């Protein structure tokens, strides 16, 4: 039952978003700015998540061996 409730909730959110998009041309400037900020924030989070995942996967899945690091020893004072 939890799965059907979740699907119903997602469908409800999608319908409200579609209704909001359809009413956007008649919206007030404040609503346009608020909606634009929300969309911009959501897109930014998704893009940053995609970049983080791609960087993580590139380092984890990459089979190339990195160059061996040589430790640096301090020099003796003269």
Swiss-Prot record:
GO terms for cellular component: membrane. It is a single-pass membrane protein. Keywords: Membrane, Transmembrane, Transmembrane helix. Coiled coil: none annotated. The keyword Transmembrane helix applies. It comes from the Eukaryota. The chain crosses the membrane at residues 32-52. It is found in: Membrane. The keyword Membrane applies. This is Small integral membrane protein 5. The gene is Smim5.
């Amino acid at each position: 039952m939890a799965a059907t409730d979740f699907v119903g909730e997602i469908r409800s959110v999608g319908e409200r978003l579609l209704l909001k998009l359809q009413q956007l041309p008649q919206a007030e400037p404040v609503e346009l700015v608020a909606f634009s900020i929300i969309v911009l924030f959501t897109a930014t989070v998704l893009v940053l998540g995609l970049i983080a995942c791609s960087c993580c996967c590139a380092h984890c899945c990459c089979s190339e061996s990195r160059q061996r690091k040589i430790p640096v020893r301090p020099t003796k004072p003269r």
